[in-house]
């Protein structure tokens, strides 16, 4: 369903006639009908905002935070977010229909640093590709989630295009990793925001440029704002073959350590206790991870959502053929409130040695590429009902 196939004037007409769930959530996209590309460099960003694209409701505005970090604000009539092209293509301050959906943190703007924990306020981080997560005992050190979170991109661009889903604003670029005699690969993500939509479509091309096979790990860390009463629905069976709690151990007997240790034991016995957010009875201080191995629909897509008490839901879907796992990450400390509803991943929340031992690396032969695809956004009540029905069908309920 994510493949590009077909073109012509009838494409948009066909999309308008397709079933609502398929059109709104997982519309089959045809060939790109047109795209006007606007390249930019770091010199475009200053204290005075510059509008790089303005086409109806689709806008892209370059500016620079007082911390010196370059930001590109992209928006349509219902959605707004800031992409950091030279800081890992991180996505900050996402709003849909005026609702802030980004994790609560102590960071009111991105800081000019490459240390993960000193700048952890974004909605979205690309992670990998040599490693993911953090190094475990006995492993050589590597940065938290490796090089992608703070990668400096080249060939950066924005622009407006048309495909069978309609008109969209795109932002993208390419990061090239070179390590003499070892690694040579490129990672090229693109974000697409369509007119009138609260759904963002993303893809990332991984290209092995070396004459030897490339083994890579990948993860996309999307951090939503926690909402008490939020209820999780997901296309992973609730059994030990598909769900694994990773209890947090702080290594001491402080009240904080004891509280999360005890909660971790309860979750390990019954992971469904985490399926409805409740800050009065649950402990996610400092954080907790639950690993899920997802089942997919007929198109290879995994689905996960958090239904909101007031109606609607936060939603994530992705092509699980290259990323069969997803982490549910929870951090609710009072100062922070972040929930990774589904963090698509090639493997689990463990270090790289564990991933290798369990066969979680993807492999690309010389010159080959993979395309990773995923979507995230805000669903209304009808769309939420359709998504839940899709999940039920996958699980045979």
Regions found by a protein language model. Give the residues of each.
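Surface-exposed acidic/polar loop and edge beta-strand patches at domain peripheries
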Residues: 2-195, 199-201, 212-215, 222-397
């Amino acid at each position: 369903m994510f493949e590009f196939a077909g073109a012509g004037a009838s494409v948009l007409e066909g999309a308008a006639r397709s079933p609502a769930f398929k059109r709104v959530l997982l519309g089959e996209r045809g060939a790109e009908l047109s795209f006007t590309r606007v390249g930019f460099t770091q010199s475009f960003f200053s204290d005075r905002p510059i509008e790089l694209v303005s086409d109806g409701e689709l806008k892209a505005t370059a500016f620079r935070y007082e911390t010196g970090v370059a930001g590109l604000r992209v928006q349509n009539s219902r959605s707004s977010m800031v992409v950091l092209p030279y800081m890992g293509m991180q996505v900050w301050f996402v709003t849909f229909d005026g609702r802030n959906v980004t994790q609560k943190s102590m960071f009111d703007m991105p800081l000019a640093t490459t240390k993960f924990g000193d700048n952890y306020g974004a909605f979205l981080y690309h992670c990998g590709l040599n490693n993911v997560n953090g190094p475990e005992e006995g492993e050589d050190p590597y940065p938290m989630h490796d090089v992608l979170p703070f990668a400096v991109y080249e060939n950066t661009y924005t622009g407006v295009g048309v495909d069978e889903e309609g008109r969209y604003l795109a932002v993208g670029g390419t990061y090239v990793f070179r390590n003499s005699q070892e690694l040579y690969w490129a990672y090229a993500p693109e974000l697409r925001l369509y007119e009138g939509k609260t759904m963002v479509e993303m893809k990332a091309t991984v290209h092995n440029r070396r004459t030897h096979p490339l083994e890579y790990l990948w993860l996309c860390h999307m951090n939503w704002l926690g909402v008490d009463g939020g209820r999780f629905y997901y296309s992973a069976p609730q059994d030990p073959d598909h769900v694994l709690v990773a209890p947090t151990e702080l290594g001491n007997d402080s009240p904080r350590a004891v509280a999360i240790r005890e909660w971790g034991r309860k979750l390990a016995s019954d992971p469904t206790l985490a399926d409805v957010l409740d800050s009065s009875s649950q402990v996610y201080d400092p954080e907790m991870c639950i690993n899920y191995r997802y089942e997919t629909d007929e198109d290879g897509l995994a689905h996960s959502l958090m239904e909101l008490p007031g109606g609607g839901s936060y939603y994530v879907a992705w092509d699980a053929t290259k990323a069969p796992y997803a982490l549910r990450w929870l951090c609710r400390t009072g100062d922070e409130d972040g929930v990774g509803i589904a963090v698509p991943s090639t493997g689990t929340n463990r270090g790289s040695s564990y991933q290798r031992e369990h066969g979680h690396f993807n492999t690309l032969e010389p010159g080959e590429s993979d395309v990773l695809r995923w979507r995230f956004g805000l669903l209304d009540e009808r769309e939420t009902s359709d998504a839940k029905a899709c999940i039920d069908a996958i699980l045979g309920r």
